[in-house]
Each structure stands twice: as structure tokens, then as C-alpha cells.
A protein has these predicted regions:
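Flexible, compositionally biased loop and terminal segments
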Residues: 1-183
């Protein structure tokens, strides 16, 4: 059986699930983070080489401030608690998206985690954070124009956050909604 090389997941519905089942959007997000561990371990077991998780979109900044802060704290906790596991399991972390909007401490932690895992090869874990595909394309075009380079498909690919990554073989969206949500 041929398994996909690259699985991309739009992590959606955790807040709605939490509100329905635990009377708290935040508890839903926390449960979703626990599921991430299972997905990562399953990806390794199935020899999937690339796993992209759409964890925080550019649109997520429109959520209530308390929910945003909770999500940012979950990200901080994930980075702090999981970095040793990433290395131990041979997982290379790569961030795609514009992380400049995140607090400086989180930016530093993200860059540190990428650096400390850069030689790992068992699984490439790509976290899409403050990511939107339209923003990604506009950003690539702006960078090309600033360098006064002729715009072409290959040049745009060179400046995308996703450069060097294979296209996803399968896209999964959790949460019972059928839309791409500005992803990849």
C-alpha cells in the first residue's frame, strides 16, 4: 500500500468541540494539542516524512483576546515541553508563516526549536503559524519586487514559506467544515 509522503491537516473545530463537550473553547484547544502528539507518533509509525499542521491562521487574530492568549500559551507550552521529544524522535521542526506578530519570547522559542532540530530527518513537522496562503503569495511577490527580479512561477516558489517542501498528498480538515481556510 502506498502511503502519503506529505500529510497536511487543518486543525479546526477544537474550540467548538470544547464548547459543546466541556463548556469551554479553551479546553477544546487543550484537547486538540493532546491529539497532536498522537498524530505525530502515528506519522512516524507510518513512515510519513512530512506533516504540516495549520495551527494558527492569520484570521485567528480576530478571536477574543483571552482565547488568543490561551492559544499563545499553548504554543509556548508545546515548544517548552516537546523540544526534547522532537529531538529524541528525530523530528525536524519548520515554521511557515509570519511569526513577527507573535510575542518576542515565542519568536525566539520558535527559532531555537527550528535550529535545535534542523539535523533531524525522520519526520519534518511543519507548523503553519500566523499563516495564510494569500498572505504568503503577496509576501513572496513583495520580496521579489523589492529585489527588482522578474516575476515568474519559479521565482515565486523560491520566495514562498513552503519552498523546498513537497506538495501535500492528502489534506485533512477536522471539525466538520468543508473549506480550505486560506491554507496552502
Amino acid at each position: 500500500m502506498n502511503l502519503p509522503k506529505h500529510v497536511a491537516i487543518i486543525m479546526d473545530g477544537n474550540g467548538r468541540w470544547g464548547l459543546k463537550n466541556k463548556n469551554s473553547r479553551n479546553l477544546g484547544h487543550k484537547s486538540g494539542l493532546k491529539t497532536v502528539d498522537k498524530i505525530i507518533q502515528s506519522s512516524i509509525k507510518q513512515n510519513i516524512k512530512y506533516l504540516t499542521l495549520y495551527a494558527f491562521s492569520t484570521e485567528n487574530w480576530k478571536r477574543p483576546k483571552l482565547e488568543i492568549n490561551f492559544l499563545l500559551n499553548l504554543l509556548k507550552t508545546f515548544l517548552k515541553d516537546k523540544l526534547p521529544d522532537l529531538n529524541q524522535n528525530g523530528i525536524k521542526l519548520r515554521i511557515i508563516g509570519d511569526i513577527k506578530k507573535f510575542p518576542k519570547k515565542i519568536q525566539t522559542n520558535l527559532k531555537t526549536a527550528e535550529t535545535k532540530t534542523k539535523k533531524n530527518t525522520k519526520l519534518h513537522l511543519i507548523l503553519a503559524l500566523n499563516y495564510g496562503s494569500k498572505f504568503e503569495i503577496v509576501n513572496a511577490i513583495k520580496l521579489i519586487k523589492s529585489k527588482k527580479i522578474k516575476i515568474s512561477e519559479s521565482m515565486v516558489n523560491k520566495y514562498l514559506y513552503t519552498k523546498g517542501l513537497p506538495n501535500p498528498d492528502i489534506l485533512i480538515r477536522t471539525g466538520n467544515t468543508n473549506r480550505l481556510s486560506n491554507f496552502l
